[in-house]
């Protein structure tokens, strides 16, 4: 069991909506995928210094002796079993990679072996495990990362807080313009007043870029991220994601 979740077996689709009252485990379910990414990135030891087994195990160590996770995608799967040391930190009792239900098992690890493995099976798994990120666009206050300028070269992927949104969109504009046009079309379906992005390096500092955009009826007036409502800028980030 993990936190408030004793056991769950759930088939996930490309888009999934979790509905439930407060405290039923929606946030904990999502945070499990962050834990999987932490394990893959070999940061389990540091993570459990702040998050001991007593906090992560369902009703603590007295009730739960180990935490198990199993993720299946097509012919491949990944499994991990975590157990607690006497000091409350966690170690990997078993880590398993599967192909067509046939596992390779490695036991008693401080950190995951998958990231450094050279086998073809584990290389394929890495593409999944390293992609497990939790994107959180809740902070839309003035001066929030989502509304701030970004380093124009910080564009390899969209960050989990959206802090490099203008740089990532600019990269799409320059390298994948059709993708950017689809994003703009999606935004207009929810925000009819939205015209287009006006993305370019700052004339005063070419290493920086702001989220500039034009209005459908007046493309000469200056608008940036601070002119968007909280819901609008969150939707732009989600459409980009």
PLM regions with names:
Residues 68, 72-199:
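Electropositive, glycine-dotted interaction segments
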Residues 1, 14, 22, 227, ...:
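Conserved functional loop/turn residues at catalytic and ligand-binding sites
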Residues 14-51, 95-97, 161, 235-241:
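Phosphate-binding glycine-rich loops of NTP-binding sites
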